[in-house]
Amino acid sequence: MSYKPFNIVVILLFFIGVLLVFFKLISIWLLVIVVLAYLFFLLLISTNVQWNFFVKAYNNNHTVTNGEIALTFDDGPVENTLEILALLKKYNAKASFFCIGKQIKENPEIFQKILQEGHLVGNHTFSHTRKMGFLRTQQVIEEINRCNKIAFEVGGINLKTFRPPFGIINPKVERALISTGHQVIGWNLRSYDGILNSKNFILKRIIKNIKPGDVILLHDNNLQTVEILEQLLLFLQNNNYRSVRVDNLFQLHAYS
């Protein structure tokens, strides 16, 4: 069931609940609990792109058996990206960078270097605003288009893949993506490198859970990610894994 008919059913059930409360057939507290549960459900489906509730997202590829995985980096390009690029080159690995438009504008040479070294770049909106979940449809479209515009000006490419900031997908983002035609790239293995401070814990968490076809979420604006990455690349090399671009993992067109 898509969101719109689902929401209509919920609204009808809510009014039925109000009537039941009015005629004292159920407690008002039961209705309050149900409403709160629904709001919590909305929060979950809006912040978990992997659930594919509003849009189809490419989170992992279960059909992969040859050890291919995808390393993905969000929130660059930044100075730290250069160290990440050096490590990827050292271990002959390819990755995907979901770039913020304003960071491309501030660091055009780094953005160009990502492309020159054969990695994928995708759209991560222009500003990566914390208000992403509250933007109107047209505002989301503008965020996506502005990022695409600066990427084209700097790199001469038209981005077709998109990763939502904070993994937020709601009906407004859904409508924006229908308008822009971007393909959504999610993840199924989150490193939490932007939240946790223990490099060993983060690395062990990835290594413990990794399997062929996985999409791993990292951040190139986090200093500890460089140290984590080298150890991770060593593990991949020693255990017959190979990092590829997400367009190759899913057989997608990255640019148009």
Residues of each region from the PLM?
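CE4/NodB-like, metal-dependent polysaccharide N-deacetylase domain
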Residues: 85-99, 119-120, 137-168, 175, ...
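Residues at alpha-helix caps and immediate loop-helix transition turns in enzyme cores, especially N-
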Residues: 84, 107-110, 173, 198, ...
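A cross-domain feature marking catalytic cores of carbohydrate-active enzymes
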Residues: 73-75, 99-101, 123-125, 164-166, ...
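His/Asp/Glu-enriched short active-site or ligand-binding loop at hydrolase and phosphoryl-transfer sites
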Residues: 174-209, 241-253
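Active-site beta->alpha N-cap acidic-glycine motif
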Residues: 42-132, 142-146, 150, 158, ...
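Acidic-and-aromatic substrate-binding clefts and catalytic sites of carbohydrate-active enzymes
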Residues: 75-79, 98-107, 131-138, 163-169, ...
